[in-house]
Amino acid sequence: MYLTSEIKKEIFKTNGTAKSATDTGSPESQIALFSHRIAHLTEHLKVNKKDYSTQLGLMKLVGKRRRLLNYLQKTEISRYRAIIAQLNLRK
């Protein structure tokens, strides 16, 4: 499987608010996890162009990440700018 518990812990440790492996609820850690999943699905769709169910799942993930980014932008702009810079996302 592409997303093992070790990979998730590493993502949460490097991107969460508390910088711990158990910080799974902060918007930063969820955005980082969604970004990892989006990158994986994008690579899958480059090979399998007609996989429309995966394409639908990818669009839903992008929407979830966008909503979390909008939430961070409205509540704490400094955390929003930090996660955008850290993950190299464009707005």
Curated annotation (Swiss-Prot):
One of its GO terms (cellular component) is cytosolic small ribosomal subunit. GO terms for biological process: translation. SMART domains: Ribosomal_S15 (SM01387). Pfam families: Ribosomal_S15. InterPro entries: Ribosomal_uS15, Ribosomal_uS15_bac-type, uS15_NS1_RNA-bd_sf. GO terms for molecular function: rRNA binding; structural constituent of ribosome. Gene3D superfamilies: 6.10.250.3130, S15/NS1, RNA-binding. Keywords: Ribonucleoprotein, Ribosomal protein, RNA-binding, rRNA-binding. HAMAP family: Ribosomal_uS15_B. Part of the 30S ribosomal subunit. Forms a bridge to the 50S subunit in the 70S ribosome, contacting the 23S rRNA. One of the primary rRNA binding proteins, it binds directly to 16S rRNA where it helps nucleate assembly of the platform of the 30S subunit by binding and bridging several RNA helices of the 16S rRNA. Belongs to the universal ribosomal protein uS15 family. This is Small ribosomal subunit protein uS15. The lineage of its organism: Bacteria, Pseudomonadati, Bacteroidota, Cytophagia, Cytophagales.
